[in-house]
Amino acid sequence: MTHLKLGTGVCAITMLLLGVACGDDEESRPPGTITQTGSGGTSTGGGTSTGTTPTGTAGGGVGGGASGGIAQNYPGDVGIENDPDVIFADDFESYGQASDLWDRWDNTFQQNQTRIARETENVYAGDQAVEFNLPAQNQELSNAVVKVLTVEQDSMYLRWYSKFDTLNDIVGSSHNGGGMSAHYDSGPGVPADGTNHFLVLFEHWRGEATMAAPGEMNVYVYHPEQRDVWGDHFFPSGKVLPNTSLPFDFGPDFQPGTDVIPELGRWYCYELMVRANTPQQRDGRITLWLDGSLLADFGNLRFRDVDTLKINQFELSFHAHNVPVETKKYYDAVVAAKSYIGPMVPP
């Protein structure tokens, strides 16, 4: 596991819309080659075996990305919303208060725990970002913003900047990142069957207090081959929760990488690509980038058995079952697009 120090720079109604599981789930640099090194591989007994760290450019064909990305043409992300491949972009600069998020997002939750942040240290770019707060309590709570797509997509890229505050000490179920889903109307605890829904969230998992907060980066996935009624967690090393002793076949081109824990209090650039498979083929894919470097590339995936099941929304969230100390998470500079976006280029 690597403690990465890069860059500077969901429950009831929310469960229904975001598809986060609320049960006992085991739960900026320019583009370039990945810099982490270490062990990786498919877990065969609760740990990770040795293996090769993934390499490759941030775009360069991985996950269908184009080298460099959309953002390189829009320094400071200025005008990026006008790019023909961009579906949505929000720098959070237009909001006077949290209730104004309804102007551009289709759903927001826990507005009494949501704030437009203006402190310099809590904004990645410009003058504002969005802040989600989780108060100290032993009851489940989810903050989120959700965008419903006008045109559903077979594949999509989602990039955002985010940081945890330094007080985060959450252990166990917590959905704390961004992601996308296809018609997750039935809510969590209903397995994907190839026709009803799928969901992918790029987040962090901390199963034990002995692990550093906020836990290891992973994708939380509802797919037809999931191992429980709750979603699976795919880690860059190839480890899959639950049942880590059971390998998962990510295809012959999968290169096990390093399971990464980000540093609290630092901004990171996260990017997620989801490509739904062709029905009756295993060509679905999930690709993750961190600060423009490839973090994980999961292939050989099956999300659907019918081509009418497409991505119809994306979200940013901060959810937990049990919060020992009040903690906050910040988001800024979110872009959804049809091709690789990449980190923001300085203006």
Question: What would you call each of these model-derived segments?
Answer:
Residues 18-69:
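Ser/Thr-rich, Pro/Gly/Ala-heavy low-complexity intrinsically disordered linkers and tails
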Residues 92, 265-301:
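Carbohydrate-binding surfaces in secreted/extracellular proteins
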Residues 98-129:
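Extracellular glycan-recognition surfaces and repeat-rich motifs
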Residues 282-287, 322-333, 346:
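Extracellular carbohydrate recognition
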